Design a protein with these regions (language model features):
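Bacterial Sec-dependent N-terminal signal peptides
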Residues: 1-25
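Non-catalytic interaction/Regulatory regions outside core domains
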Residues: 19-168
């Protein structure tokens, strides 16, 4: 069983990204950069405000999650989570990788977006693995931090410090 897990993790680490320069920091945390034209794509399509870091909370594919993360569509708990963090200079959005469920989400939420042109799925290969969520933070230079799976307040603060050039 241990060998199967090790093989899965090795394959997962090779498949987590496509079209981005990426380094693996730990089992589920990645850092890297995307080119300027991809930053421009994000600003154009996801209401990324000038002078801010973009925080993206992903709800991944139903097929990659052992539970239905779309059962609860309301994200009030997530809004409260970010409000308590009191982060400055951030644009916070949510991406649904399930297009057929997106219509339900966008009726009540203006900060939910589709994965336009499969940008995130193709660039970061979020179809791989068995996870329900992913968290990404990107600065305007294109440097990013990505955590696949569950995340904590500490992850968000660490990502923010790293992208500002500080040590967490």
């Amino acid at each position: 069983m241990k060998n199967i897990v090790v093989i899965f993790l090795v394959l997962f680490s090779f498949s987590i990204v496509g079209h981005a320069q990426v380094d693996r920091r730990s089992e589920f945390v990645f850092e890297g950069s995307i080119p300027e034209h991809k930053v421009a794509f994000l600003k154009q399509n996801y209401n990324w405000k000038e002078g801010t870091k973009l925080i993206i909370t992903f709800k991944t594919f139903l097929s990659t999650c052992p539970r239905n993360q779309y059962r609860v569509i309301d994200n009030d708990w997530n809004d409260e989570f970010y409000r308590k963090l009191a982060l400055k200079n951030v644009t916070n959005i949510y991406i649904s990788l399930e297009d057929n469920l997106l219509r339900k989400l966008t009726k009540s939420r203006k900060d939910f977006y589709e994965d336009k042109d499969d940008f995130f799925t193709k660039t970061f290969n979020l179809k791989s693995g068995r996870h329900c969520y992913a968290l990404m933070m990107i600065n305007e230079k294109g440097s990013f931090m990505l955590r696949v799976g569950e995340y904590t307040e500490a992850d968000i603060f660490d990502f923010s410090k790293i992208l500002e050039g500080e040590q967490p």
